[in-house]
Amino acid sequence: MLLHIPGLFDADEISRIREALEQADWADGKVTAGYQSAKAKHNLQLPEGHALAKEIGSALIDRLWCNPQFMSAALPHKVFPPLINCYREGGNFGFHIDNALRQPKGSPERIRTDLSSTLFLNDPDSYDGGELVIQDTFGVQQVKLAAGDMVLYPGTSLHKVNPVTRGARYAAFFWTQSLVREDSQRTLLFEMDNAIRQLTADVPEHPSLLQLTGTYHNLLRRWAEV
């Protein structure tokens, strides 16, 4: 499942974030890549624990916990603290699959990367190239969203970032460990939850709603890991 979640940050917030990022001190993005991924990774990144990265990440996570789309699709259990990257002219990241497990710096806890997310932090017309290309059971998708919008997709997906040929591309990225690790099961639950919400709006007194809601929770009970 690939999901577009719009409008997590508004235009004024994005403007302030972009100004801060343009003044930031960046490090080589290879520091958080695995052995194989590092060979394909050519970008910049704010160091883990950087004050600006923590500020943006905290605001993002707070909004996601209140976002019905994210909560329904991801069924989040743990979220890796968001990282911030920058692709300038020539920057790119070849095809790769993210590491299965991630450990936040300074934490003993590991997170299984069931879902990957990218939040775009500048307008798509401010740079050329830089598309996020995701290859999975849904086919090949090229993603280049408006500033403040986020894409959510399976951590098992082969993906890359096309070379930036003009300007700079700023983004936040992170991983989520879901209560339900299997993508097909999460997709089924997401579609079922959406159908229940729509039926509740259209025919709120329909007797089948109780049964459908019960079936949703029984499936979640069967598949969830806590």
UniProtKB/Swiss-Prot annotation:
Gene3D superfamilies: q2cbj1_9rhob like domain, Rabenosyn, Rab binding domain. One of its GO terms (biological process) is intracellular iron ion homeostasis. Binds 1 Fe(2+) ion per subunit. Residues 78-178 form the Fe2OG dioxygenase domain. GO terms for molecular function: 2-oxoglutarate-dependent dioxygenase activity; iron ion binding; L-ascorbic acid binding. Its EC number is 1.14.11.-. Pfam families: 2OG-FeII_Oxy_3, PKHD_C. Fe cation binds at H96, D98, H159. Keywords: Dioxygenase, Iron, Metal-binding, Oxidoreductase, Vitamin C. SUPFAM superfamilies: Clavaminate synthase-like (SSF51197). 2-oxoglutarate binds at R169. It comes from the Bacteria. Its cofactor is Fe(2+); L-ascorbate. InterPro entries: Oxoglu/Fe-dep_dioxygenase_dom, PKHD_C, PKHD_hydroxylase, Pro_4_hyd_alph, Pro_4_hyd_alph_FE2OG_OXY. SMART domains: P4Hc. It is an enzyme of class 1 (oxidoreductase). This is PKHD-type hydroxylase PSEEN1031. It comes from Pseudomonas entomophila (strain L48). The lineage of its organism: Bacteria, Pseudomonadati, Pseudomonadota, Gammaproteobacteria, Pseudomonadales.
